[in-house]
């Protein structure tokens, strides 16, 4: 259910945003919010990730954009300089529809890192919000 999900996917065009003084549109965007929740009698930190993908894209571009944004949702916040990676900074002529070996290895590394998500909290935590660089 959406109330329990950590990742919510929306078919909506992300708002344009200003980058280095220039307004830019994008096919997708991911926003991370760290929330203080109460579950099973315990307070803990959980990620709440909103993924937005423009609905008007052709099928391959929509799939590639969704895969790229899900990479951000799963913790890959940076971009790759290699155009054949899902997390390449922009889609080339041929959208990447399958994660590369580099993408998979990076995700495996991220998943092995320690996190405070799920830990019991004793003091209130101020919410934080972050947005992917596209």
What is each of the regions a protein language model found here?
Residues 57, 82, 96-100:
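A general structural signal for short secondary-structure boundary/capping elements
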Residues 88-118:
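Post-HExxH zinc-binding segment in Zn-dependent metallohydrolases
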Residues 8, 49-53, 84-96:
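Surface-exposed aromatic
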Residues 1-70, 77-80:
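Metzincin-family zinc-dependent endopeptidase catalytic domain
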Residues 63-67, 84, 104-108:
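Extracytoplasmic/secreted envelope proteins and their assembly/folding machinery
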Residues 114-115, 119-134:
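Pan-zinc metallopeptidase signature
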């Amino acid at each position: 259910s959406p109330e329990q999900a950590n990742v919510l996917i929306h078919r909506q065009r992300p708002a344009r945003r200003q980058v280095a003084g220039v307004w830019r549109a994008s096919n997708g965007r991911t926003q991370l919010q760290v929330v203080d929740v109460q579950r099973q009698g315990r307070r803990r930190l959980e990620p709440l990730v909103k993924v937005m993908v423009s609905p008007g894209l052709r099928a391959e571009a929509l799939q590639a954009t969704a895969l790229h944004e899900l990479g951000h949702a799963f913790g890959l916040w940076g971009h790759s300089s290699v155009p054949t990676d899902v997390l390449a900074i922009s889609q080339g002529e041929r959208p990447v529809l399958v994660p590369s070996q580099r993408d998979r290895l990076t995700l495996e590394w991220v998943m092995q890192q320690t996190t405070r998500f799920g830990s019991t909290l004793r003091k209130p935590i101020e919410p934080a919000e972050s947005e992917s660089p596209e």
